[in-house]
Amino acid sequence: LGVYDVRYNSSVDLQEHVDVGLSRSVDGGKTWEKMRLPLAFGETGGLPAAQNGVGDPSILVDTKTNTTWVVAAWTHGMGNQRAWWSSYPGMDMNHTAQLVLSKSTDDGKTWSEPINITDQVKDPSWYFLLQGPGRGITMQDGTLVFPIQFIDSTRVPNAGIMYSKDRGETWKIHNYART
């Protein structure tokens, strides 16, 4: 399985018409099935697809349950500026990027509706929270872990991890890396 941005209009990053694409191979990468969209918002909340971009995905396979998770940043109604500069403190989807998940229990063939976990993991003082870089892992005790990054209240970039100890039902941010 491989996840990536599907950028329809140009190479421009969020905010733009961007969906999360997934390619699936069952023969070690010799051939690939038709692209799937585990996260795509299209026209949502009265706004066009270009105002509902979702991208920069990270993937995690829960090796204990064989559930695949994809996490990405969704930018709803933030104009045409880049998400790094048009996402603001708070939690409202019209003003701050949302962190969303989708899960598959059939090896990436089908995907759940988006699961918005912003309220679980974002500090309201932060400007922007998103996943990555990199992919997630399953710890030996079953804890699911994704890398994250965020812009704090002073506009300083930070990195860390978010984790779930209950198979993805709830998520928390761990102490983040500081220099």
Question: Where does each model-flagged region fall?
Answer:
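Asp-box/BNR beta-propeller blade signature and adjacent active/binding-site loops
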Residues: L1-T179
